Amino acid sequence: MEANLRRNYTTNLTHGVFGMTGFRLIYAPTIIPAYLYLLTGSAAAVGLGTALLQLGGTVSPILSGAQVESRKRILPYAITVGSMMRVMVLVLAIAAWTLEGTALLVVTLASFLLLGFFSGAQRVAFQMLMAKLIPIDRRGRLQGIRNMVGGLIAAVLAWVAGHYFIEQQWLGNGYATTFLLAFILTSVGLFVLRLGIREPDAPRRRPAIPLRERIGQFGDLLRHRDFRAFLWAHGLAAIARVGLPFWTLYVGDRLGLDGALIGTLSFAFLAADTMSNLVWGSLGDRFGFRAVYLGALISSLVGMLLLVLGEGWLVYASFVFLGFGFSGWMMAAVTLVLEFGEHEDIPMRLALTTTVEGGMSSVGPILVGLSIAALGYAPLIVAAFASLLASLALMLWRVREPRTSA
């Protein structure tokens, strides 16, 4: 690990900045919901699109974990699934320019499903790469710097996309232009990763066994008390995350949804997401990522309170707190899980965590979209508060810090 640490650290950072910048334009809870709402005029359709994006990432992590846990080298596989993920973003752009009506909606939804599938596979592969290449006490800072720089650029680009690309219909379709920009940025990052990484052989590997047999061994992973409780807490937090794409529509109902509002909310969310990353990363390196997870849940609760009760500038402040919470939640989820149990079980722990998260996030948006159409936003608000509080209670009383409990 130490022999090529400086090179691998720099390469991971550069790849992460480009990838984070591009994919934040896709995954920020503003642009995609607004795009689907433009195509359909339906909150239920926004829920379906978000659900497909998450559903694709529900099954693939387990398949990806089975692929990487018995390999000496993970990089070739990671490049393959990463490339396919970027192709799906390009398909979104081409479809937006060349199709219309039902054909455009069908291709867009299919692209979301496949984008989610390859995203789930990539997440397992790339986090396993980090576990091999970067020491545990430097992962937080690496992710913090990567997310801060990439997120800051993404926040500015999201503002530009809303106020110029979308509002002024650049190149004939502002959303297509935004998707194309995301494809270019993420592809540059993947190219840097392919050329720069020097990956050592895995220190320990599981023997290759049939997938069905490996799935049957999941019970062994769940015997780890803290990991089992963490999965429950993470699943509950994922329920609250389901609401993120709908909060833009919620604010839009109150203030009027247009390109300028989309750009401003995107900037508030992504800028907060960005600037908080160094704080979360340093906190995680020093005190452990359980503390980061707790802080992220508290920040999300504050954001929800401001969103529901606030007026004027407090509405924009709510997106700042939601962005702060989201960044900490994402960083802690993918880093804390690396520290439970044995090294050779990391791929499947990542797979289980991502599958639980994806399962909650795939069913939820459909139910939320239908609920909003029938009953308004009140059921979503109650469910988000309840799940965040339950997750916080589990993390406080059932999950120990793995660095001190081993």
Spans of model-derived segments:
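Juxtamembrane intracellular "pre-TM" segments in multi-pass secondary transporters
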Residues: 1-6, 199-232
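Helix-loop boundary and gating motifs at the non-cytosolic
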Residues: 1-59, 68, 75-78, 85, ...
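Helix-loop junctions at membrane interfaces in 12-TM secondary transporters
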Residues: 9, 94-111, 308-319
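Helix-to-loop junctions at the C-terminal end of transmembrane segments
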Residues: 60-73, 165, 276-288, 372
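Structural signature of the two symmetry-related core transmembrane helices
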Residues: 76-92, 183, 291-306, 385
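Intracellular juxtamembrane helix-capping segments at the cytosolic ends
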Residues: 119-134, 328-342
